[in-house]
């Protein structure tokens, strides 16, 4: 099985689950549950590792209780950490997540850490597949180092990454696979719809692009061939937080096992469907047997 390196910052998710609505200014609303879990960039490597994939992560955890709690969960999950952790005075990013039956919203603090970019090449050289985010590819020589060492580069994006279209598009030729949601695809491509965006973006990466569409599944392109995949209902919906991160984990799980592109898409769709049955973007009950049984 191929080794995966994830490059991302982590945050601590404070999840107010089962909210009947979102409070306005001066209002207070009670949810049915409350959970604290690692979030952000931690979701993909945790799920990958729980599925049995060898995973390491270049990240930075703060010198506080939340940073130490995230570190314990990552290590418990089997994720190897690259970089200096808990440096004196650093603070962990935090997101308060208010989750309703249909969607969620966030109030976040960005933290004061920073990744140890001086060890970037060493970390990349020891992996087979590198997973990171478009913003990092714009700022650091990740694509160049992956090319130098012959590593596959799979990149996720968020809306903030794609708003600067010129800079984001300039990064695409160094990327093997780009994963975006429908809104991000339209924004980045400048096209009117997801289908046109798929063709536009797919022609600018090395291998292809995946466009996720929530409950409508998604569309993808690999070496010029179009694919469509459905959303998969894996149980009672609880929380949409981390569905995209887990699609990425499922896709990478498939690729690391040598599955075909459409098989890897199916793995991603099924793990995303499973993720929305949890509160938060990861769950320690996940294992390979559980996912394979659901296949």
Located regions from the model:
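Ribokinase/PfkB-type carbohydrate-kinase core domain
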Residues: 1-11, 72-86, 98-227
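Conserved phosphate-binding/catalytic region of the ribokinase-like
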Residues: 4-5, 194-295
